[in-house]
Structure formats: structure tokens, C-alpha cells
Amino acid sequence: MLGIIGIFAYKLNEYFSEPVINAKSINLDASPSPKSKIIERLKKDQKIKVLKKNNNTDWWQVEIGSQKGWVASWLIQKKNYNTKNAGRLAEATIVLDPGHGGVDSGTQASNGAMEKTYTLRTALKVYKLLKAKNVHVIMTRHTNKTVALASRPALSNRVKANIYISFHFNSAGEQNAAEGYEVFKYHHNANSFASTIDKQFNNLPLYNRGVSFGNFEVLRDNKRPAILVEMGFMDSDYDFSYIQKSSYQQKVANDVTKSLTSYFN
């Protein structure tokens, strides 16, 4: 099982008529942990009954025949997905990647505030907005967890994400040496969405540094349309005065959601 911690909570009566195994094969585990004892291997297209969802992780308790156990929720295919009032965006799979986490704090502001805190807060706000639109959205982490860098694009590739967004805040290495937000892309398949979100970000109160090529592992190893957004400089007094505010994080989240809606619809 993948060791990525995410969140994938559905209202079953709204989203499923019948859950089905989507991967070639997955483990049915005795407990919601990748280190758990394996009860059996489930095969693609097997039908299961969902008994319980752990809303703080990506694990679901399921029943198949007389066996009960736990599976990773992103390996369950959604059937009869409810697209009412959501349009084509509701048919997409979006992966949100809050940068850093756990032992990796990322960069820091002059007061010691850590990048990992604000990437998570911002991504969670996007997650909430997308879920309200019935979007199939997966997060690489939803708490202060350590997530291996390579596993982030691996998850995007595995679930065949239609869009992958990695959230970050920048650092110039010297106080007040640079400022502004920036959108990075690596592969050509991300060009269109990178331009869309950059235009939407124009109403942010920070300087627009534009769209740039970014040779980052989470983009380079990602076969899906993937971007990385640096939403301001942690070591800029001006930028950080906004970064630390929930209202700025919400504004970024609103713009990301509007960009996705525009891109798909």
C-alpha cells in the first residue's frame, strides 16, 4: 500500500450506487495502516460494501463476502458520480499537495513561522471549496505529516489526476530581497492551466512574477497536468503580512477554485 496520508471522505448516498475496486489489486488490511496485517488481496472490479469512513485519513472500512477490513479510498472507483450543479469539474480528479510537512518545515519567516503550516491551511481551504462542488479531490496530506517527495507525483500518476497543484511559499534567502507569487510548470500539458490560474491570481495583493519553468521533482516526475504555486515570500515582510492572514489564504483558495471551474467548464 502507498504510504501517503490523504483525505477522501464521501457521502455515500450522494456519490455511490456501488463501490468497485479500481486498481489492478489492493490489500484488504486488518487495520487502517500501511503496516497492518494483510487479510487478502482484492482484485480489480470486485464489488464491496463500505461500512465506515475514517474522515481523518484515506482509509475506508469495507466488507466483501464474509471478510471485513480496511482499504485506501483512492483505489475505489466512484460510480454514478453526482454532477448536479457542478458541470465537468465534478468529473475531474484533483490532487492538492500542501508542500512540506512533518519533519520538513520548508522555509521560515523572520518570526519563525513555518511554510508547512501555511501550505496546509491554504490547501485545506481549497479542499473545502471543491468538496462543496462535488469534486473528486485528494490531498497528499491533511495534517502535519511527513510525506516523501517522490510519493507526491507518484500519487498523482496513480490516480490519473486531471490537475495536480503543489502549494508552496518562497524564500529569497535574504530578508526583503524579493516578493510576489509565481506559478511553475514543467511539462507542456500544464501550460493551459498554468496560464488560467496566473490570470486569476492577478487580483491578489502581491506582485505577479508570472509563469515560469520549474525543474521540481513533483512536476518533473508527474505525467499528469501539474503546477506548483509559490504564493508569496516568507522572508518578505510585506508578503508575509498577507501570508499569515486567513483572509489571504481564503482569497488564494477562491482563485484556485475559480481557475479550476474556468479550466474545466
Predicted segments with their positions:
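SH3/SH3-like beta-barrel superfamily modules
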Residues: 38-74
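Hydrophobic anchor at the start of a short beta-strand
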Residues: 137, 208, 226
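SH3-family beta-barrel domains
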Residues: 1-30, 38-44, 53, 77-88
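Short alpha-helix capping/helix-loop boundary micro-motifs
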Residues: 32-37, 145
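Active-site-adjacent mobile loop/cap segments within catalytic or ligand-binding domains
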Residues: 166, 184, 212-265
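Catalytic-core regions of hydrolytic enzymes
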Residues: 80-195, 200-203
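Alpha-helical scaffolding within the catalytic cores
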Residues: 149-153, 211-216
